[in-house]
Structures are given as C-alpha cells and as structure tokens.
Swiss-Prot record:
Provenance organism: Mycolicibacterium smegmatis (strain ATCC 700084 / mc(2)155) (Mycobacterium smegmatis)
InterPro entries from the UniProt entry: GCL_type2/YbdK_subfam, GCS2, Gln_synth/guanido_kin_cat_dom, YbdK
Keyword ATP-binding in record: yes
Keywords: ATP-binding, Ligase, Nucleotide-binding
Xref: Gene3D superfamilies: 3.30.590.20
Protein name per Swiss-Prot or TrEMBL: Putative glutamate--cysteine ligase 2-3
Entries under PANTHER family matching the protein: GLUTAMATE--CYSTEINE LIGASE 2-RELATED
Pfam families, sorted: GCS2 (PF04107)
Catalyzed reactions per annotation: L-cysteine + L-glutamate + ATP = gamma-L-glutamyl-L-cysteine + ADP + phosphate + H(+)
C-alpha cells in the first residue's frame, strides 16, 4: 500500500451562448443531461456555471483520464442544451449581472451580498489532498502561504473580460477577493483559533456558514483533506494535472516540514497581498515576489522552477519529478490560459476568437 496521500480535483466551468458568447442560464438542464450519462454535475451560485468532481485518485495518469472524461461529458451535455462549455476563469463577454441559481441557500447569498454575488460568474479549480487530521490541514495551510501566488500565476486564465484586456493575467482573483472571507489564508496558531475566526465571520454576517469560508487554502468541511483553491480553472486538462500534482507534492512537503519542526516562513498580510497582486497582474510571463527567501522581485518562471526543486523529494516519491519539470517547461514555452487568451484576442480584438480558443482547449488531450 502506498504512503502517498490521495487527492481529487473539482473544476468549475462557464456555460455561454454559442452565438453571442454571453453566459447563459442552463446549468440545471445541462446537469440533468450529464446525469443521464453517469456524470454528476454540481450547480454553482450562478445558473451559468457547473462543477465537476473527480473520484479520489492515487496517481496523475488516472486523474488526467478522469478530468478529460468529465470535461467531454459536460461539453456534450452543454451542446445538447444549446450552450457551450468553457474552461475560463471569467467569461470574455459578460452581461450586467449573472442570474442566481434558485436554491434557498444561493438566494440567501444573493440577498445578503448583493452585487458581489450577482457578478459571481467566475470559475476556479480546487485540489483536495488527504491529510491525517483537521489540525494538520490548518498547519499545512500555514506552510503553503509562500507558494500560493506562484500557483496563481501558473494557472492564470482570465485575462480577457467584458470584451477587452483586463490588464491582469487573472482578473478572476481580483473579483474573488471582494468576498470578505476570500483570498490568502490567514496564519493560525491552532485549530481553536481557526474555529474562533470562522465563528466571528459567521456572527458578523460575512459568511453564512463554513461552506462560505473561501480562503485559498482551508480544511475541507466534507472530506479528510486540505483544499487548495487559489487557481483559475486551467484552460487544459494538462495544466490542471500539473497544478494538482504540484499541490499534492506541496502538501507532502509541508507535512514533512511540520513533522520535522522546521520553522514556518514568516509573512505579513500586506506582503502576501502584494505578491498576490503582482502575480495576478503579471502572470506566468512576468515577475513576482520571492516570498520564500529574499522578498525580492524576480521572474515568475525562475521562482516556479525553484519551487519545483523545493518539492523535488516529494515529486520523486510520487514518481512525478521528470514529468512535472517537462510539463512546466512546456507551459512556459507555449503559454498558459491567459497567454493564449491574449494571443487569440490580439488577432482581431474580438472576444469571439477567445471563446473559440477556450472551447477547443477545454476538451483538448
């Protein structure tokens, strides 16, 4: 039996009108069609979104196959119902507001949070990695903080928004940060402190319940996992697998460091926020802040390469080191979702070209 932690992935997708590219409220019909094909799609806050979830996985090859199948079934279900499925952090074109999915909980969120909720047609990717306890998940979260902005830059896939270049590689992360319980995870000294903070947010009305604790790392409230949710939904299956594998190795590395009593990298909230902003703006082909060592600004690809080396023992234990190095090099050379969006947009400065690019990438092998 392997000592490696199991993992799983959730991906959120947009449903858009095939003719106009605008988000289209078809999630219930699409989910019903997918269910007939054996795939359970979850309804998200807005009715132009669906979410897939893999089974519990123990290797990246099976994860790749599962993600591809889920994306293709969801794509077919969308087309059956007159919609197009996009793996994108934001729609390249967007209406004034997104219709809220009509469930009691989502209606309550829409009523309490107003325009924040009604502009919430954004899509991320969440990776769950097995941990021994809830307390372990919180301690792992503390140790992942210096690396999250690098994963954000790597997976950026929301550059084009409202028919123009947003100026950010991931504008999704900027919009997401408006929620009072979103963004980089705070540092917690204990499980008790975590619980007290969550209780305070709920008492203040900043979250309905612990399901609305949207920090980019959190202990799952459903599974024995730590959940890393910093990413835009990646454009391709290959990029999602790369992201998930890095997260799995990072959790393993953090767990080992905790066991060995290694010091946690001290980070103030404003430094972490600055690194997030820099990574969100510049993306993979820009520069960001080295939070692990110098706090100097350096090329993002250099810091990502250093990150992979930091994870090398865990990646080698998983048998993934060479694969991850090769896949990272490929993404650096060919571009991630944000870079592909911009290349498509620059051809004619038409959002339709971006949508075509995203739709093809969504189901590419």
């Amino acid at each position: 039996m392997s000592n490696n932690p199991t993992f799983g992935v959730e991906e959120e997708f947009l449903l858009v009108d095939p003719r106009t590219g605008e988000p289209i409220a078809r999630n219930k019909a699409v989910a019903e069609t997918a269910a007939a094909k054996g795939v359970d799609l979850q309804l998200e806050l807005t009715s132009c979104q669906v979410e897939t979830a893999t089974e519990v996985m123990d290797n990246s090859d099976d994860l790749r196959k599962a993600l591809l199948r889920l994306r293709r079934v969801a794509t077919d279900a969308a087309e059956t119902n007159g919609a197009r499925l996009l793996a994108a952090g934001l729609p390249p074109t967007v209406p004034h507001k997104f219709p809220i999915t009509p469930t009691p909980r989502y209606r309550r969120i829409g009523h309490r949070f107003g325009m924040i909720a009604h502009e919430q047609g954004i899509c991320g990717c969440h990776v769950h990695v097995e941990v021994p306890s809830r307390d372990a998940a919180i301690r792992v979260s503390n140790r992942l903080r210096p690396w999250l902005h690098l994963l954000l830059a790597l997976t950026a896939n929301s550059a084009i928004y409202r028919g123009s270049d947003s100026g950010y590689a991931t504008f999704r992360s900027v919009l997401w940060a408006r929620w009072p319980s979103a963004g980089p995870p705070p540092f917690f000294d204990s499980e008790a402190q975590y619980d007290a903070t969550v209780a305070m947010l709920e008492d203040a009305g900043a979250a309905l319940d612990d399901g609305m604790i949207y920090w980019d790392v959190r202990p799952s409230n459903k599974f024995p996992t730590v959940e890393v949710r910093v990413s835009d939904v990646p454009a391709t299956v290959a990029e999602t697998v790369l992201f998930a594998t890095l997260v799995r190795a990072a959790v393993m590395t953090a767990t080992e460091a905790e066991k060995n009593g290694e010091p946690v990298v001290p980070l103030t909230d404003y430094v972490l926020k600055a690194a997030y902003w820099k990574s969100a703006r510049d993306g993979l082909d820009g520069r960001t802040i080295d939070l692990a060592e110098s706090h100097a600004v350096a090329p993002t690809v250099e810091l990502l390469t250093n990150f992979v080396e930091h994870l090398r023992p865990a990646l080698e234990q998983l048998g993934e080191y060479d694969t991850v190095r090769g896949e990272l090099a490929r993404v650096i050379e060919t571009g991630n979702g944000a870079m592909r969006q911009r290349r498509a947009f620059e051809r004619r400065r038409e959002a339709a070209d971006v949508i075509d690019e995203l739709a093809a990438a969504t189901i590419a092998e």
